[in-house]
Amino acid sequence: ESAGLMPHRRYWGQLDRATFAFGYGLMVTPLQLAHVYATIGGFGIARPLSITRIDPPVMGTRVMPESIVHSVEHMMESVALPGGGGTKAAVRDYRVAVKTGTAKKIGPDGKYIDKYVAYTAGVAPASRPQFALVVVMNDPSNGSYYGGAVSAPVFSQIMGDVLRLENVMPDGMPQGAENLIVMHDSHPQGPAL
């Protein structure tokens, strides 16, 4: 895995701070980005990265104040709501907290070219995050290239399928509607062999 690129804070100038604010000037892999979102979903507690469930859960280290993480997650949740830039990332009956993004690619001469990377990253369900997901689309070619248009629908489909397959209780339904849900036990007689 690539180490990514995040210059040390002591070397940040005004231009660095400005470009970091909209996602330029640093490089991370999708896995590293998913780890950051898992930390946000863990309310500021960083745990070792794992693709599969670790049982019992591993203790983590607090890396962000919980109050700040709740504020960030609340802002991210508004992205998938009507009026937000990532409404196509919404998952029916679930609250999701997402961030969409679009970056111009750099050509061999070091200048920006008319090719893009679109991404959508987030956690769900927003009320008690259990899953973090990052969808990256390299040089989308269907006419649109914004994260909110091309990667957000893929995020919605994957996250929705994961939440339903894992029998995660919906958190975006009106009060009392949970009685209308039929949950299926995926392992009625123990795990399948």
Please identify what each model-predicted range represents.
Residues 130, 142-144, 165:
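Intrinsically disordered, low-complexity acidic/polar segments
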Residues 1-137, 147, 190-193:
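Beta-lactam-recognizing serine transpeptidase/beta-lactamase-like catalytic domain environment
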Residues 140-150:
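A short acidic/glycine-rich loop-to-helix N-cap element
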Residues 57-60, 149-193:
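Short, gly/Ser/Thr-rich active-site loops of penicillin-recognizing serine hydrolases
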